[in-house]
């Protein structure tokens, strides 16, 4: 059976699975730190690389390999390297492909911890990073130097759901001799396939939609075998490895990914449309709305707007924007107050004081993250119950 001839929904259920001699129908969980050899000669061959096979779960593990193969099939990638977290996926990508003195151009509209990694950690190791507008291609072009190795973007971005032209940005990167890295966390392969649009590398925080129920931490880097070889080399040495148990959970999550993402997107579009009509809302950010600045571009790259909706709360007289945002968040009874996203449960957070709290005020302003901004990762509850939980917005005029 040639598995890749099937539709993506079928691949999410069937791709990557390997059966043991016991004939299990669900992927096996290999909770092993190491693997036995038949002889000293075989051990030497495995360690020397002349014979394929498992050695130690920091290097490879059968359950992790099945997860990697399934996600690679869904993203159309030659190879996937699974990591312990989404942040370690970014770190492994950069450390595998860049050296001291190299230059990275990154969107300023990215996750706050990603900004910290680029600005505070990698800079100490001699990497230069320039932050530019996600949507201004001229800024990307102007930022290129003779040492530029990577372009890094989130599209849609966190939390303002800005969208970049992946094909156009890939063209600029390739002409500069650089690789385009796309964090596809918000969309997943169920909604967007960056490699097909010209990107070279995909980053995932598997913690989010791939898990789908807020249980485990994990990440992934995907791309060609040539690009993934040094990324895997860093992982094997540094040990930022995905655990077998977490990989097993993510395998189960991938089986329902397409069904869940459809439901998340339907709920998110309905909620965003409703929010635009509420007097307590000053502005809504959702790429599935025709009012979104990059709506046409988003719909040409994505099959839907995804599950993340952000909006600015309109403050009442005598109330600061942050006070207005916090009042709304504290008034919710159903939606969970937490910074995670991609869960079946809807979550709500105030980016300026949570996900982007360690970013400088100047950087937040440049990224458009204002004090009245609220982000909701729309879950799988009934839409009427979500609207009811946000009913405070109907009386905030």
Question: Where in the sequence are the language-model features?
Answer:
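Conserved PLP-enzyme active-site core in the AAT-like
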Residues: 2-3, 12-21, 79-279, 285
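N-terminal "arm"/small-domain region of PLP-dependent enzymes with the aminotransferase-like
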Residues: 2-61, 69
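Glycine-rich beta-alpha junction loops
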Residues: 17, 31-37, 186, 208, ...
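Conserved N-terminal alpha-helix of the aminotransferase class I/II PLP-enzyme fold
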Residues: 39-88, 113-120
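Short, solvent-exposed beta-strand edge segments and adjacent coil->beta transition regions
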Residues: 51, 216, 304-308, 371-375
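PLP-dependent enzyme catalytic core of the Aspartate aminotransferase-like
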Residues: 119-120, 128, 142, 315-319, ...
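Short, well-ordered beta-strand elements within core beta-sheets of diverse protein domains
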Residues: 250-259, 307-318, 375-379
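Conserved small-domain helix->loop->beta segment predominantly found in fold-type I
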Residues: 269-345, 360-365
């Amino acid at each position: 059976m040639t598995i890749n001839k099937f539709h993506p929904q079928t691949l999410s259920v069937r791709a990557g699975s390997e059966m043991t001699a016991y004939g299990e129908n669900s992927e096996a969980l290999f909770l092993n730190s190491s693997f036995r050899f038949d002889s000293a000669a075989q051990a030497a061959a495995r360690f020397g690389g002349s014979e394929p096979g498992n050695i130690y779960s920091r290097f490879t593990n059968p359950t992790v390999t099945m997860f990697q193969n399934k996600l690679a099939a869904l993203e159309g990638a030659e190879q996937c390297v699974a990591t312990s977290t989404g942040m370690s996926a970014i770190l492994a990508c950069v450390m595998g492909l860049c050296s001291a003195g190299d230059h990275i151009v990154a969107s300023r509209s990215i996750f706050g911890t990603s900004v910290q990694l680029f600005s505070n950690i990698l800079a100490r190791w001699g990497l230069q990073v320039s932050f530019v507008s996600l949507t201004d291609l001229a800024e990307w072009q102007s930022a290129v130097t003779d040492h530029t190795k990577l372009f890094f973007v989130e599209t849609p971005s966190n939390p303002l759901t800005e969208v970049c032209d992946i094909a156009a940005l890939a063209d600029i990167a390739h002409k500069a001799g650089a690789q385009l890295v796309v964090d596809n966390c918000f969309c997943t392969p169920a909604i967007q396939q960056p490699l097909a649009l010209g990107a070279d590398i995909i980053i995932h925080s598997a913690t989010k939609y791939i898990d789908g129920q807020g249980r485990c931490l994990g990440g992934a880097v995907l791309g060609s075998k040539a690009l993934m070889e040094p990324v895997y080399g860093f992982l094997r040495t540094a040990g930022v490895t995905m655990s077998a148990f977490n990989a097993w959970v993510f395998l189960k999550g991938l089986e329902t990914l397409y069904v869940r993402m459809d439901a998340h997107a339907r709920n998110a579009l309905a909620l965003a449309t409703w929010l635009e009509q509420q007097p307590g809302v000053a502005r809504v950010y959702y790429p599935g709305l025709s009012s979104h600045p990059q709506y046409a571009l988003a719909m040409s790259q994505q099959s839907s707007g995804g599950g993340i909706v952000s909006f600015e709360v309109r403050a009442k007289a005598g109330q600061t924007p942050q006070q207005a945002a916090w009042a709304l968040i504290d008034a919710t009874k159903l939606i969970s107050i937490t910074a995670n996203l991609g869960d079946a449960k809807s979550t709500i957070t105030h980016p300026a004081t949570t996900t982007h709290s360690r970013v400088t005020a100047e950087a937040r302003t440049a990224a458009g993250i204002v004090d009245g901004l609220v982000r909701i990762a729309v879950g799988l509850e009934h839409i009427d119950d979500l609207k009811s939980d946000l009913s405070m917005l109907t009386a905030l005029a």
